Amino acid sequence: DTIKHSITTHRGCYGECNFCAIAAHQGRTIRTRSEANILQEAKHFTTLKDFKGIISDVGGPTANMYGFECVKKESLGTCIENKRCVDAHRLCKTMKVDHSRNIQLLKDIRAIPGIKKAFVASGVRYDLITADKKHGYEYLKEMVDHHISGQMKVAPEHTNDEVLHHMGKPGKQTLIDFKAMYDKLNKESGKQQFLTYYLIAAHPGCEEKHMHELKQFTTHELKMNPEQAQVFTPTPGTYSAVMYYTELDPFTKKKIFVEKDQ
């Protein structure tokens, strides 16, 4: 039932978190469905007897990667050297982040007669929102005003910058900046909506002291008490699995701590 009335807008992910295998399964290039095709599916829902007017999700592996790609990658393929579209510190300069198509798509779905709500339940990359200086704020406002069912899913995974580097995730300051933007928009809208954080414990490079740091950060900066965290599980075909097995950073060949005993 969760996915019965949901819409997949695209496939692929160029986030390349070191622990994630989505890029291996679906590719590093975003394959975006046309707006017309997506709207046709949304209109079809309204003809179904069991449809109550609620689309449970409009998204993909990363909801806000819809509608834009690196022009260089689309014509020449992914970079062959060890270069990422999004790394732990910045976006590649040829990746022009643009949420405008996504914004218009969500507006068009809302305008369909018989559609009461269209939620975006898939996770979003908050670093893409903060990087889009032209449309990022507008996209988040659109989400806050119309497309969040009480909570928005984001995946910082950790808050220690050293651990985040090993994960291939953006630094904690990006999360702080995003949360400030999110809180501001919710206050302006008069809504009480929250952020749900995906967190990972015991990733290669993560020591007990880092988990204490995480607890302090979530309490004092995020103003919440995590109820759960996923214990790292090495997934075949990922850099994090290489780190787990070799106890080395595959990019620097430096020794890293790997929790295996407890």
Task: Tell what function each PLM region has.
Residues 1-21, 39, 46, 52-57:
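N-terminal pre-triad scaffold of radical SAM enzymes
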Residues 13, 38, 154, 229:
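Conserved, mostly hydrophobic/aromatic
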Residues 20-37:
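Iron-sulfur (Fe-S) cluster-binding segments and ferredoxin-like electron-carrier domains
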Residues 44-196, 200-204:
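Conserved SAM/AdoMet-binding glycine-rich loop
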Residues 138-151, 215-236:
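Structural recognition of alpha->loop->beta junctions
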Residues 185-192, 214-215, 243-245:
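Eukaryotic scaffolding regions of large macromolecular assemblies
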Residues 203-220:
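Catalytic cores of alpha/beta
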Residues 209, 223-226, 231-262:
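C-terminal accessory regions of radical SAM enzymes
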